[in-house]
Amino acid sequence: MELLQQLLDFILHIDVHLAEIVNEYRTWTYLILFLIIFAETGFVVTPFLPGDSLLFAMGALIAGEHETGLSIWIMLLILIVAAILGNTVNYKLGSVLGAGVFKENNKILKLKYYHQSHEFFEKHGGKAIMLSRFLPIFRTIAPFVAGIAKMPFGRFTYYNIIGGVTWIFALLIGGYLLGQIPVIKNNFELVIIFIAVVTFVPAIWAAIKSRLKPKKIEEIIEGEDTRS
């Protein structure tokens, strides 16, 4: 519970915490953010990391009146690489570990997350890798599911690169350009909440649909295991 409260505080006051990180670590901030984005996209057990709000807030901070010593273009390049590499690692983990890591009683790797991502992947195919970048939870699990489904690596990489570049550019540069507009700057906490709510709505809707139309997810996993 305490960890959840700390995470919520970090998200709601992410601009303050990022400023503290920059003041303390300066250019090491590049590495810190690289590791956060890499972890969120690279490990199926870390879907809770606040990627969207982090990117927007970082862009706004670099554009602010306080000197950070950071370059928006270097940050952009580093985080694009982190996002692409993270998804690639996640894909490889999925191809090796398979669907059996998802359990009904697992608080992080829930069966319903696998089920929702599997449906999303089946519906949109390769585009799911690109579209899921903008959907919390899905962006962490979609490349893992692609690995389980043995999606051709070349096709996966194509959508992975497009999605990674688009996601990082949209939110980081969006924060850089919009973060200093007075109405946004003066209500930054509300903007962060808005970003979090908007990006989580599709995941919440998918969860509701999953409850309204329950399916035997175990059969899906057994089918994946049989094919492997």
Label every model-predicted segment.
Residues I36, L97, I162-V165, I173:
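A generic structural signal for solvent-exposed, polar alpha-helical segments
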Residues I168-G179:
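Transmembrane alpha-helical segments of integral membrane proteins
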